[in-house]
């Protein structure tokens, strides 16, 4: 239909090569709604008659329930929809639908509408997952576990503290995506192919109809720039990387060697040959799919970095990367929420491992600091105690007075003071005395949980307001269309 300048049609193999009709299934609805807003604006600006608008809008409305044939011969969904409108409304009316519009502003409109909906879905899923983390944390405020650095036991901690850490990380993912929405929710419609149009359209009118906050003003920028796509996929890549980190922890902790947690059967797979196996395949796939999302980002950046200003057909290729990114992240968040809420925590094993380790070493050093001894001296003493415990194959709490005396050699510290401090410290007392803001201390858990629940509520309120604004605009658009048809 678009080949008026060219004499011959594309061969079947060439058409298959250039066609994006399969990828365009994800934006069909947005293309129809965007076209309806454009036609309504053309009528309001007296560019087309009410009779023409009625025929076009009725045809577009009927297409919302249509099942499209990917073997139609159209290069993309835009051509297919216009061809169907012309077939139903006639060329004299349907042929006016594309007035003052190009596929260049049309496709980027569809992509922006699709991504903004995906962001709202992901943000809702994020809040559900964050809420699940906080909910599980609330039930494990006294569940003792070792905390790790370099995958080596570092300090005694609480499982709630671990879960809240990831709740905070995902909250930042929410905030990043929430902010990205503001830059995506700008309408490119009316920018034309690249330099605008001589026809008296109203770009702000269509932007308002479709729930956009504003327009992408510069027509070159509006049609050719895909920085908003790169930003969106980048934000989701960070989100998936954060989920992958949780997945890695849970894969390790669900092993027989750790036995800290057990995943529900619905999130594991058996071996094809070893009947005793319970493999964390879902978590492993999360790591793998994170790589896929990062690959999508790389594909997008690699595509756009080589383009001159103005639209290039290369940009057609990034759509599948966008859809894949959205699908993977939404599925991952839905799975993680359910997985967290069905997680079995082996509290006894966590505590046993914590108490059998020398995780009170830093507490000993800090107690000595409170006696006025320089930290570097106390660090040396605690390190010596740990080494002696390791060599004698017993915990620090079981060291003899003779051992302790060796640990303070070359210092002026009284070994009796060290013995007294060791005798007073347990894992539980350590956590009770942990007072720093945001620490693993018992008191901090209650405060942080309360604070996070409030933040989740505030986030939901803001998100609902944003969704309602878009829905209200689209409902108003539908009413205006219904008045005409």
UniProtKB/Swiss-Prot annotation:
Query: Which reaction is the catalytic activity of this chain?
Result: 2-(N(omega)-L-arginino)succinate = fumarate + L-arginine
Q: HAMAP family given for it? A: Arg_succ_lyase
EC identifiers of the protein: 4.3.2.1
Question: What are the protein's GO molecular function terms?
Answer: argininosuccinate lyase activity
Similarity comment text for this entry:
Belongs to the lyase 1 family. Argininosuccinate lyase subfamily.
Per the record, its GO cellular-component terms are: cytosol
Q: Which CDD domains match?
A: Argininosuccinate_lyase (cd01359)
Q: Where does it localize?
A: Cytoplasm
Entry keyword set: Amino-acid biosynthesis, Arginine biosynthesis, Cytoplasm, Lyase
Q: What is this protein called?
A: Argininosuccinate lyase
Pathway stated in the Swiss-Prot or TrEMBL entry: Amino-acid biosynthesis; L-arginine biosynthesis; L-arginine from L-ornithine and carbamoyl phosphate: step 3/3
GO annotation terms (biological process): arginine biosynthetic process via ornithine; L-arginine biosynthetic process
A Pfam cross-reference name = Lyase_1
| Keyword Cytoplasm attributed | yes
């Amino acid at each position: 239909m678009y080949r008026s300048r060219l004499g011959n049609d594309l061969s079947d193999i060439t058409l298959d090569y250039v066609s994006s009709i399969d990828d365009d299934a994800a934006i069909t609805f947005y293309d129809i709604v965007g076209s309806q807003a454009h036609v309504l604006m053309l009528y309001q600006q007296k560019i087309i008659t009410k009779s023409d608008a009625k025929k076009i809008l009725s045809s577009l409305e009927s297409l919302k329930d249509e099942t499209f044939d990917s073997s139609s011969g159209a290069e993309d969904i835009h051509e297919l929809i216009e061809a169907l409108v012309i077939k139903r409304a006639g060329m004299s009316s349907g042929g006016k639908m594309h007035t003052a519009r190009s596929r260049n502003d049309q496709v980027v409109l569809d992509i922006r509408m699709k991504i903004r909906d995906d962001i709202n879905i992901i943000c809702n899923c994020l809040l559900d997952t964050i809420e699940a983390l906080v909910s599980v944390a609330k039930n494990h405020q006294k569940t003792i576990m070792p905390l790790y650095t370099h995958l080596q036991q570092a300090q005694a901690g609480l499982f709630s503290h671990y879960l809240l850490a990831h709740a905070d990380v995902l909250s930042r993912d929410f905030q990043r995506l929430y902010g990205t929405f503001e830059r995506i929710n700008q309408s490119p419609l009316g920018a034309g192919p690249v330099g605008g149009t001589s026809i008296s359209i109203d770009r702000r009118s269509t932007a308002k109809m479709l729930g956009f906050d504003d327009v992408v003003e510069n027509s070159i920028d509006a049609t050719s720039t895909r920085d908003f796509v790169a930003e969106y996929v980048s934000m989701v890549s960070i989100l998936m990387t954060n989920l992958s980190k949780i997945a890695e922890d849970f894969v390790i902790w669900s092993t027989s060697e750790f036995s800290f947690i057990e995943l529900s059967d619905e999130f594991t797979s058996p071996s094809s040959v070893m009947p005793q196996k319970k493999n964390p395949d879902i978590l492993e796939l999360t790591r793998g799919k994170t790589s896929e999302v990062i690959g999508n980002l790389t594909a997008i950046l690699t595509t756009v970095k080589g383009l001159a200003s103005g639209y290039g057909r290369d940009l057609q290729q990034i759509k599948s990367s966008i859809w894949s990114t959205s699908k993977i992240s939404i599925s991952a968040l839905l799975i993680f929420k359910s997985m967290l809420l069905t997680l079995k925590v082996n509290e006894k094993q966590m505590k046993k491992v914590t108490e059998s380790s020398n995780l009170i070493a830093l507490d000993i050093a800090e107690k000595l600091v409170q006696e006025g001894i320089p930290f570097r001296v106390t660090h040396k003493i605690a390190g010596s105690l740990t080494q002696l415990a390791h060599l004698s194959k017993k915990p620090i709490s079981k060291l003899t007075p003779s051992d302790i005396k060796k640990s303070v050699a070359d210092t002026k510290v009284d070994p009796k003071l060290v013995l007294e401090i060791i005798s007073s410290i347990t894992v539980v007392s350590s956590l009770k005395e942990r007072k720093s803001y945001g620490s693993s201390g018992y008191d901090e858990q209650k405060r942080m949980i309360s604070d996070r629940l409030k933040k989740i509520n505030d986030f939901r309120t803001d998100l609902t307001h944003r969704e309602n604004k878009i829905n209200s605009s689209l409902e108003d658009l539908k009413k205006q269309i219904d008045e005409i048809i």
